[in-house]
Amino acid sequence: MFDGLSTYKSFFLVAFGAVPGAICRMKISDNLFRNKHNLWGILLVNSSACLLLGFFLAKQNYIHYINNDQPLYLLLCVGFLGSFSTFSSLILEIYYLFVDQQWMELFLFTFTSIGLGIIFISLGSHLFNA
């Protein structure tokens, strides 16, 4: 992944993108959905991250700087979207549902999250494929 750049520059780009991604995730989740277990916030953030990732995937063929070893890819796709999307929060909420034996919510949330992720990455790729 880091073949085109020095390792330190690659790490810096990922970190530089990760900080605003994490802040955006926190602001969206906290401001829109204030309860402790915010399944809707996680769905919103992850779906929008998948939509943006679909956009970048669609543009990879046309914009050299979005290829896997390029600065823009590391900054936006790995850094920003990697910290903006909330896989660990997703798993934590699934765990809470499991521990609380809320089986219907667990399966609904899990499959909705995965399904929306696939739909939104496909939608982003389709909408922005030029």
From Swiss-Prot:
Q: Name one GO cellular component term.
A: plasma membrane
Description of activity control = Na(+) is not transported, but it plays an essential structural role and its presence is essential for fluoride channel function.
Query: What Gene Ontology molecular function terms does this protein carry?
Result: fluoride channel activity; metal ion binding
Any stretches that span the bilayer, and where are they? 4-24, 38-58, 72-92, 103-123
Give the residues the record marks as binding Na(+). Answer: G82, S85
Q: Give the GO terms filed under biological process for this record.
A: cellular detoxification of fluoride
Its keywords, alphabetically, are: Cell inner membrane, Cell membrane, Ion channel, Ion transport, Membrane, Metal-binding, Sodium, Transmembrane, Transmembrane helix, Transport
Kindly give the InterPro entries that the UniProt entry links to this protein. FluC (IPR003691)
Localization per Swiss-Prot or TrEMBL: Cell inner membrane
- Which reactions does this protein catalyse? fluoride(in) = fluoride(out)
Q: What membrane topology does the UniProt entry give?
A: Multi-pass membrane protein
Q: Which HAMAP family match?
A: FluC
What functional role does this protein have? Answer: Fluoride-specific ion channel. Important for reducing fluoride concentration in the cell, thus reducing its toxicity.
Similarity remark:
Belongs to the fluoride channel Fluc/FEX (TC 1.A.43) family.
Q: What is this protein called?
A: Fluoride-specific ion channel FluC 2
Q: Give the classification, highest ranks.
A: Bacteria, Bacillati, Cyanobacteriota, Cyanophyceae, Synechococcales
